[in-house]
Amino acid sequence: MTRAVALTGRLTFRPGQVPGIAGERPQLAERLLRGRPGEAAPHLLPRLFALCGEAHGVTAALAVNAALGRVAAPEPALFRRLAHETACEHIRRIWLDWPLHLASGPVPSTFNSRVPQRELIDCPMLKASHSESAAMLAWLERAVLGTAPRRWLAHWHEDPAGCLSTWATKIHTWPAMAMRQCMQVAQAMASMPAPLLPHASTDALRELAQSLAGEADFPCRPSWQGRVFETGSWTRLGLADCSAFGNMWLRLGARIAELVLLSLRDGMQASGEAHDSPCLQMGALALAPGQALAWSEMARGLLMHWVRLVDTPQGPVIGGYRIIAPTEWNFHPDGAVAHMLAHLAPFDAADVRRSIGILVAAYDPCVPYTVEFAESLGDTVHA
């Protein structure tokens, strides 16, 4: 085992087998933070979870403040930080991962492979000096949508499936082409989402917090109300109907739609326009004295932090710290991806790999994985 795998963990995908997933990620937060002052959590965790460091830092700050009795509505700046990181992560995954996981078959002769690279480099949102929202919306229109962002998003809200089909078949940007190439297979991968929404209810949050506090291995194998749920950009608390995303095609589309929405909201804030509420929710709940649970909706789904502070002569220090990240729900051995993997018919290794690529693009495990076929195929693939 390499040092990197020891830190991040590794998943094994087992198509056509039960369970469809094996392996887990190490729970490092408590080992890193135990005995440190509470204020250490929002400073150290972003270094441990670099890809989504902002989300972990924001959520840790909310949890520690609530445990110290400082419960208040999150400041607007926290929502802006979370939204910016989420949009950037969507862009990176679409440009860096989708070429590996979604593209298949012949590439059109008119396609220049250097164009996506230039577009990623030119993306205003990814620049350290990003401040011009109009430039980001213009980039979205040119590099992603092929039409005005507001027009595309209005079509999406009216008819998600129709919007994606029209866009993927008529527009020649790199993301549209990638979606076009996986369209038939992704649409056939039907699965009604079971959305993880405990942050809709204080009672549900308390129930989850009780499990987190009482079961050391709960973050590795979380469940709620006896079930394993899924989380992603298609299960946001602010969405009217999560059941509209009934296949992998629409779940992939939800990431595009959220990128567009976050970019438009960024533009509205820059111009002083009002809007009803943040796209992404966050909050904290004080529990027993010195304990709190905080949550945030980040790029891969719902992130939860639980903290327990203990008093010492030098002041409160961390006595317990547990995190449930979206990966633990989505790639649970009894979760959504595992069920899809178990039902894949492993007769053609190439077809199975393509289906796995679509699942990985939609749910994004954020850790290395291995594909382990049944003995009849005699093949193991590393990714």
Swiss-Prot record:
Swiss-Prot/TrEMBL keywords: Plasmid
Gene3D superfamilies registered for this protein in UniProt: Cytochrome-c3 Hydrogenase, chain B
Protein name per the record: Hydrogenase expression/formation protein HoxV
Species per Swiss-Prot/TrEMBL record: Cupriavidus necator (strain ATCC 17699 / DSM 428 / KCTC 22496 / NCIMB 10442 / H16 / Stanier 337)
Gene encoding the protein: hoxV
